UniProtKB/Swiss-Prot annotation:
Zn(2+) binds at residues 908, 911, 926, 929. L-isoleucyl-5'-AMP binds at residue 568. The lineage of its organism: Bacteria, Pseudomonadati, Aquificota, Aquificia, Aquificales. This is Isoleucine--tRNA ligase. Its EC number is 6.1.1.5.
Amino acid sequence: MEWKDTLNLPKTAFPMKGNLPNKEPEIIKKWEEIDLYKRLREERKGKEKYILHDGPPYANGNIHLGHALNKILKDILVKYESMKGKDAPFVPGWDCHGLPIEQQVEKLLKKEKKRKEDLSKSEFRKLCREYALKYVNIQREEFKRLGIIGNWEKPYLTMRPSYQAQEIRELGKIFRKGIAYRGKKPVYWCIYDKTAEAEAEVEYKEKKDPSIYVAFELVESPFDIKEKVYAVIWTTTPWTLPANLGIMVNPDFDYLFLRSEDKVYIVAKDLLESFSEKTGIEGEVIKEVKGRELEFLEYRHPFIDRVSKIYLSEFVELGTGTGLVHMAPGHGQEDYIIGQRYGVEAFAPVDDEGRFTDEAPEFIQGLRVFEANERIVEKLRENGVLLHHETVKHSYPHCWRCKNPVIFRATPQWFISMDGITEKGETLRGEALKEIERVKWIPHWGENRIKSMIENRPDWCISRQRSWGVPIAVFYCKRCGNIIDDEKVFEHIADLVEKDEFGADIWFEREAEELLPEGYRCPKCDGEEFKKEEDILDVWFDSGVSHASVLKSGFWDELKWPADMYLEGSDQHRGWFQSSLLEGVASYGRAPYDAVLTHGFILDEKGNKMSKSLGNVIPPEKIIKMYGADILRLWVVSEDYTEDIKIGMNLLKSIADDYRKIRNTFRYFLGNLYDFDANKDRVPYENLLEIDRWMLSKLQRLIDRSHSAYSNYRFHKIYHEIKRFVIVDLSAVYLDILKDRLYVYAPDSLERRSAQTVLYELLDSLTKLLAPILSFTTEEIWGYVREINPSVKESIHLEEMPVVNQDYIDPELEETYEKLMKVRDDILKALEEARRSDIIRHPYEAKVVLSLPDEYRSVVEKRIDWIKFFFTVSQVELSDQAEGDVIIGGEKVEGGKIAVKKASGEKCPRCWIYDESVGKDGQPVCDRCMEQLERMEIKISDIEEAK
């Protein structure tokens, strides 16, 4: 036997290296074997529910880091609420309809030398369904690999018949409330995908366009002006001029009549200088009027034989141009509003492909709108009304799918009216704004953001001219044109869809008469022949009804309505948050959520957006293969996710280093608890050593701060709090001090059991606090905890969070140890200086002599018998005058002095402490070690080194 064999050295099978890429799939397998999600539901049955409703990702392609960030954040929150003892089910979902899937299917058809037109709608929809299902299955496995716990066996899919049926019922409710209508209004239109687009589906990018100033000749010169008078407009969309049906001026602005040679130009007073700079036109101001005095003046179109009028509009601003705005109600939202006010139709001589129809002048018929710009500019030049022409770069809406510029185009569409009166006698807009005030928005600026959007948004265009989606289930009477929007008919169609294996396909396979209730007649003219609506619903309506199709459906008995939380990227203020809010308010008079939490976007290490063109995209799979999913989860909480969050290989390496430190701390716990039975060996609080009570007090503070951070969704605070606690408070101080006591004292001594009791508390609490974040590693640790305490649950995720034990909080003790820590910090500096001066090589070779102010001296003096272990030296002496080989002034302890000299006595071969009892009367070890060996019934004669 050797001296080291008499020590309680750490023992554990918990590996130093995580080997997460290989270990994590084994843990997922364990969760599946024990059916963890079902077990959670059983354990939490009857408890208060917490519902985080999953915003559905799009079933197209593999997941990217944005998906990972989103799902991990949701998982952290759901796991925390579950570990607080709540019933927190999570039903993941997928958005399965829409144009991107249609486009992918068309690409596949092209490879087979087929076209969409060669298939029936049902055949095409079948291919779309198969494509969506393929990616649902791919993404499901990718999300599970991230450690997300949820109802993966029964997710919600927007293409599932029961979901589609509820969507049709929701549409029926909106029609019953009288706020759905069909109208011809300008909407975003993609001329390449040939469909209307939602505001949330456009993205703004730089585009080059002509910038022109055009003179429109007034039919008669007003105010007794002799010369010809021209109203001057400025536009960057010359292609909209064929649809010009008016000019708008602001009633409150001042407008000037500027005489230049034999012509007079009308321009806003505040824009005269910039107008003259651009056009080179200068002259004499002969008249100044308010905008309202120009109302109803008539002018001639510059290249069409048409007379139109000047109208008043509050939308006209003085930022650029002339203060007179060309009005095309068929191509602009504000133009349309003013047109409606004055009874001017929405005219748009442009077809689905963006080509001018025969309603446009002959010289541009058949041309696409952007191609026509040049021809129109040339025509204006020929007619002598082009005052200035240049090319400008400006921000312009583009289709988020095909990346091409979109146009505003008036087409017959279905809308939900924002200003129609609901059952409560209020507008949908007004009700939605009230709900926004009731909902909790995190971060708080989200409230103003969505409020501003709702205040200013146009009516919601819910129709799309595509195949893969849920039909707008209305009919038209062939005899009188009456729209059949009877709620009973909606209910009948919903029932048919729900019972059919392929759901809404039935709409495209059957004739109108087969779909309507038997013997149905037009309530207006008694007609028997009907036509189906061909348009489908906007995908934002699809996902916007998820609260009803999922939470209210009863298909998932673990759920409830409304949701406690919606959590998505900040772009969803104009997307899913908004569509869900409007649908919820329209159908049920309230928002379907009580709180909304948003996260930012992912940037590379340099702060650039992730893009394939920059080559800075990192697939989650790459990170998982290299480091494991827990490192990705730790990255999610490493920064404030409510802002944009950076990622890169250097950052991940740094996070992996932090992970290793945390893991090694748990290894220390487990290694020193190998002979500890949590049910038998715990030391009662009142018998614990003082330093152990101090650490328990500090642990309670950490538990309290962690709960506060989780409850306020400040997950990065938890990471930094625990990281600091583990690295600074534990590894650098407490665990370092504890080694001597754990190794040297007899296994069942009070000194050792006291330390082990607190180690177990630390292990138990920290594992639970980290479980929502490091879901795999904490599960691995919990397997070893079960060996120490077989009464714990089978999975860490079935456990509940630690709660603060007020009895363990000791502010006075914390204050005492704050002082001792300051003394310790100064001692460590002095020891470092002594090491540099070759006085000592190891702290145990040192004796420290302390000269301290009274308040510090008294706390050390009370603990003089054992304080050397706290300072990790062999001897401590208090003196009025610190004398030694190295003397330093106190940095932390003002007025203090620390002297370091060689410790007296010999080095104990067992504990390495220098003590005068070593060698005395032939004793090979110090008195303390002799006592422990006797307790352990180990004879000196049995130790080889002692012979």
